[in-house]
């Protein structure tokens, strides 16, 4: 009987908040980071198009179990809309499908912003990862098919005009999961009667991570010059953020080492005392600052749903 294969790479865990450069795909970025860190597992918390730059949170090791909590968080983008053309991809990459010589006044742009704030119905771009009949919309679009993509509700918490010129307007948006900034540019262009597409897009925030957490890819690649393997990996690991930081919006409990052992074995622990936390469907437990488990608090117990190895 053959022995099970050991996973390749180091069993490290944590978040690397990459400042993704332009013309670099999200999957390509994850592969590069996994290779640099010699990690067993890696995954990202939300695709960033090759023509977009900025924050791409990448989870290594056990941190991949916390990816859904980051994907569901608020995001902030800075973007520029070029007026006068609507394009097939709703950004610079596509072909022009509609054009207009009209250009919007700044007052008209500002007057339009409330329409796109709050819970809105939005149709994703034809070139998107939305599945239609089991196939990705972008695959169908590349084959020349025009498909009906149903509108979806998304939430925009804030939409601000930063500045404008005759052919361009610069915005900042804070939005929830599933919001397509390309669709926003397309729809605003139609409403203003001039058409529009994304000329530049940069993500600056994915809750709970901020701009101060971002690391340029060039800084990480530069560490390849360190010949000593252990020294190079230690320098890379210094950029990692603790796995538990992704859960900072959830209720938290601190446990001792004995309780941590029970939780990691999949067993519940009893929460006693006047300061015992209130029931909640999701909370996370740490021991000595290290993430132990995600679980629910019910009937005076913390019941683990996902456990994390000793980090």
Swiss-Prot record:
This is tRNA pseudouridine synthase B. HAMAP family: TruB_bact. GO terms for molecular function: RNA binding; tRNA pseudouridine(55) synthase activity. It is an enzyme of class 5 (isomerase). GO terms for biological process: mRNA pseudouridine synthesis; tRNA pseudouridine synthesis. Belongs to the pseudouridine synthase TruB family. Type 1 subfamily. Responsible for synthesis of pseudouridine from uracil-55 in the psi GC loop of transfer RNAs. The active site is at residue 49. InterPro entries: PsdUridine_synth_cat_dom_sf (IPR020103), PsdUridine_synth_N (IPR002501), PUA-like_sf (IPR015947), tRNA_psdUridine_synth_TruB (IPR014780), TruB_C (IPR032819). Keywords: Isomerase, tRNA processing. NCBIfam families: TruB (TIGR00431). It catalyses: uridine(55) in tRNA = pseudouridine(55) in tRNA. SUPFAM superfamilies: Pseudouridine synthase (SSF55120), PUA domain-like (SSF88697).
């Amino acid at each position: 009987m053959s022995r099970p294969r050991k996973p390749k790479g180091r069993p490290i865990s944590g978040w690397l908040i990459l400042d993704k450069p332009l013309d670099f795909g999200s999957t390509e970025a994850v592969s590069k980071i996994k290779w640099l860190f010699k990690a067993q597992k890696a995954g990202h918390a939300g695709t960033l198009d090759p023509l977009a730059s900025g924050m791409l949170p990448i989870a290594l090791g056990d941190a991949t179990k916390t990816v859904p909590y980051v994907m569901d968080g608020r995001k902030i983008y800075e973007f520029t809309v070029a007026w006068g053309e609507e394009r097939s991809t709703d950004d610079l990459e596509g072909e022009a499908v509609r054009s207009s010589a009209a250009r919007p006044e700044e007052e008209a742009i500002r007057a339009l912003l409330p329409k796109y704030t709050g819970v809105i119905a939005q149709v994703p771009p034809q070139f998107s990862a939305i599945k239609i009949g089991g196939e990705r919309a972008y695959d169908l679009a590349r084959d020349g098919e025009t498909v009906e993509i149903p509108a979806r509700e998304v939430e925009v918490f804030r939409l601000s005009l930063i500045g404008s010129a005759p052919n361009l307007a610069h915005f900042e948006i804070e939005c929830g999961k599933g919001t397509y900034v390309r669709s926003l540019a397309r729809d605003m262009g139609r409403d203003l009667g001039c058409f529009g597409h994304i000329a530049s897009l940069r993500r600056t925030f994915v809750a709970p991570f901020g701009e101060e957490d971002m690391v340029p890819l060039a800084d990480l690649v530069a560490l390849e010059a360190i010949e000593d393997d252990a020294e190079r990996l230690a320098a890379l690991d210094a950029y990692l953020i603790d796995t538990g930081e992704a859960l900072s919006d959830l209720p938290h409990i601190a446990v001792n080492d004995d309780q941590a052992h029970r939780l990691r074995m999949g067993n519940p622990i009893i929460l006693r005392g006047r300061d015992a936390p209130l029931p909640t469907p999701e909370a996370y437990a740490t021991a000595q600052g290290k993430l132990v488990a995600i679980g629910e608090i019910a009937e005076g117990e913390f019941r683990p749903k996902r456990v994390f190895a000793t980090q």
